[in-house]
Amino acid sequence: MIIAYLYCLAPAPAQEIAVLKYKGGGDWYANPTALPNLIRFCNENAGTTIDEKPETVEVGSSSIFQYPFLHMTGHGNVVFSDEEAENLRTYLYSGGFLHIDDNYGMAPYLKKALTKAFPDKELVELDREHPIFNQLFKFPDGLPKIHEHDGKRPQALGIFHENRLILLFTTESDLGDGWEDPSVHNDPEEVRKKALQMGANIIAYAFKN
């Protein structure tokens, strides 16, 4: 209740996002050029005015309540303490949004951590008709495949609270790699474009919902 009260008092910027720093040994800091590039793309193509240098906030910090959108990524282990799990849950139930992009290898650890934060909820796959795929840019086939890795199909998985999508987990897609500077992965321009457009859709959807 105290956290929720602080959330109401905090000067929350209308359009700001932050990187979520978590414990467990996973590289929460992966893809350092990804988010700034996505923000720049959104500011140029989606009418946003997001700070191009996103802040970093820890899962258990009250600072997360200052941001309507959090981004999380990595390859490895993810661990939430009881207090961190409660803080994240309160943030999301209070109107926040979390996008988690699997940088390949994160999924099994993340799902365990999410079970702790949301013991009564499950990740459910979004179908291709979900509005998140039809915001500024149209993705009739759903989440695009950016990097092949093991060739599995990309999935957009969500957690809902009171019919609102509060958490989006994108896996087997690697959107963040597509947002990075062109020199990092040497992706074709068309691949980077798809990744950035899907990212813009996610941000646009989160800001409106």
Language-model features, listed with the residues they occupy:
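Short alpha-beta junction capping motif
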Residues: 17, 69-108
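Extracytoplasmic/secreted envelope proteins and their assembly/folding machinery
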Residues: 32-39, 85, 89, 107, ...
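Surface-exposed patches in mature extracellular/periplasmic domains of secreted proteins
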Residues: 49-57, 100-103, 121-129
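Sec-exported extracytoplasmic/periplasmic mature domains
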Residues: 43-47, 90-93, 115-119, 207-208
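Bacterial N-terminal signal peptides
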Residues: 1-8
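Short, surface-exposed beta-strand/loop micro-motifs that present aromatic residues
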Residues: 59-60, 151-167
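Acidic, glycine-rich loop-and-strand cores that form catalytic or ligand-binding grooves
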Residues: 112-143
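Aromatic-Pro/Gly-enriched surface loop or interdomain linker
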Residues: 12-69, 73-76, 166, 172-175, ...
